[in-house]
Design a protein with these regions (language model features):
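C-terminal outer-membrane beta-barrel translocator/porin domains of Gram-negative envelope proteins
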Residues: 3-155, 160-172
């Protein structure tokens, strides 16, 4: 995959963004393996999905990184069509050579898919001296979600959930 990125820091943008201002060409190749035993892709009631992936950027272009990730989820259909599920994921990204991991390659958590209750991309390291209250992204992340859902009427469910997770600044820092 070949992608073009532009970071255009303006006005009172944190210094961290100014340091990465410019155009980037990213060439990326990724290999993944997935096992999916869920009974449905949308609103599964039983089974699981497990995925491992590895990626490499730097076959030309300006971005020189590699990444690894693992994600898994499992669903149990209990009495009365209630469902208990666990969803978890871990990832890491690092650079090679004399390059840094650009902000668009860094890891973040937050939002409806991994850390509900937090704003999108709000869970990540930040350095007040460099970026004020803006997150700078990290190089290692982990999250785990527990959810129990109860049917209200057909196709409508109410859920109770508990999400945990973290993002660290260093690669392979779990």
């Amino acid at each position: 995959r070949l992608e073009q990125y532009r970071i255009d820091a303006e006005g009172n943008a944190p210094i961290f963004f100014w340091q990465q201002d410019g155009d980037y060409l990213r060439s990326h190749v990724e290999l993944s393996y997935t096992i999916d035993t869920r009974d449905a892709q949308i609103f599964p009631r039983k089974g699981g999905k497990f995925e491992v992936l590895a990626g490499y950027s730097g076959l030309g272009g300006d971005v020189h990184t590699y990444n690894f990730g693992v994600n898994g989820s499992y669903y149990w259909n209990l009495r009365g069509d209630t469902i208990f599920s666990i969803n978890a994921g871990a990832a890491t990204v690092d650079s090679y050579g004399n390059h840094d991991v650009p902000i668009f390659e860094r890891l973040y958590l937050g939002g409806p898919y991994n850390m509900r209750g937090f704003r999108f991309r709000d869970v990540a390291p930040y350095n007040p001296a460099l970026s004020g209250d803006e997150t700078m992204g990290g190089r290692s992340s982990f999250f785990c979600q527990f959810e129990y859902s109860i049917p209200v009427i057909e196709e409508v469910r109410v859920a109770v959930f508990y999400d945990i997770g973290f993002v660290n600044g260093d690669a392979f820092d779990f």
